[in-house]
Every structure is written in structure tokens, then in C-alpha cells.
Amino acid sequence: MIATYRESPAPGPLSSHACCVWANVAGPGGHLERVLPDGCADVVWIEGEGIVVAGPATREVLVDIPAGTAALGVRFGPGAAGAALGVAARDLRDRTVALEDVWGAPATELAERLAGAPPAGRLALLAAAVARRLDGAQAADALVARASGLLGAGMAVTAASREVALTDRHLRRRFHDAVGYGPKTLQRVLRLRRFLALAETGPSPDLARAAAEAGYADQPHLTRECADLAGLPPAALLAARAAA
């Protein structure tokens, strides 16, 4: 077994800020995880290490997980983490910071409670603690959320700006504050995600068709973007994901 990973919708009040919660346990041989950018940010508890905020990434992150290590997380969709955590998302871009630097002593206390809790109850404990902390937190930027959805569906940045009645410049500024980077970068990230979803449907992926349907100009365009964002060419990335 390489790892055991499970993901579920954010429960109760937490769902107004977060998109999901997740739990992972590395297998007996450990695991090198290639985490791809997705526009999201996570509050993550790692057994033996404490709690961190993993900010929105613009490239792949390789995480070496020792054998048997448990990790839990609360994931915030594009544009949600900054408002919920009370920090500018631009300050979290491509960074992992201790939650204590954001929340102070309550983060340390929560980490201690998680370390001492029964494994089966840890995810619920983390979700409940984050939900309490976010009670009354600022809502995410609704225009950024709407524009993110349009970009995820394949709309061009300029067209998305018009749809939300903002200039390209104003949309970029709001994206940097809320998402951590501009709409063009999020568009690239979400396009790669669309390609992977298309290519991983069915037993024999048609890379050319998946690339075209995802919105790439041609296969060289896909290859460049895949190498830049994921660190591997398309076929190698798909093979690595299939073996994980």
C-alpha cells in the first residue's frame, strides 16, 4: 500500500469557507507525493510536525512523507483562504507557514490536542476547531469566486472581467489579494486540471483530444505548460499519477 487518502465535503458551518476536508496515511514504504497546483490553500496537521498553512502554489511541490505518517487537512478553494484566515493570499503564495504565525497560541494548543486525540477522531476535531475559529470571518470576494468559476470553465480572462463588470487591472488586483496570484495564472492551473480530468477518463487516454478539449492551442503548448506547472511532460505525469 502506497498511501490511504480520503476526502469528504467540509462539514456543517465549515462548508461556508472550505471546500473539503481530507486525511492521508503514508504506506509502510513511505511516499513521495507530487502535489500539483490547484488554486487552493490548506490548513494541514502533520503527525510529529504540527500545523501549517500550505499556500496556493504556482508549480508542483514534492512532499516526502515518512512511512506511516498521518496528515489531515482543511482545504480552501481559490479565493477563500485569505478572507477566512485573515491574511493576504499573496503572502501565502508558494509558501508553507506555521499556523502559529497566523493564529498564535491557539494553533499550538490545537496541535497538542490533535497529537493526543484518538486517530479516528482527529479529522473531526480539526474541522470543528477551524470552523469555530472562522465563525464571523470575512466572506470571500464574491466577484473573484464568480470569475474563478468562469475561468475554470474555460473562459478567457478578458471575457471573465467583462462578466463580473471589472477591468482587467482591477480583476488582477483582487485576484492577487484573494487567490494569491493573477487570473491568468489561475486559468493556466485550472486548464491543466481540466486536461488531467479528461485524460484520466477511460483506459487509453487520447492526449491530443484531451489537450484540445481542455483549451490548449496544440500539444507543444500542453507540453510546455505541463512541464512548467507539474515538472513532467504529459505522458510521464499521467503515468506517475496512475502509479501513485
Spans of model-derived segments:
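Alpha-helical bundle regulatory/interaction domains
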Residues: 1-168, 178-183, 197-202, 206-217, ...
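DNA major-groove recognition helix of helix-turn-helix
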Residues: 175, 187, 225-227, 238
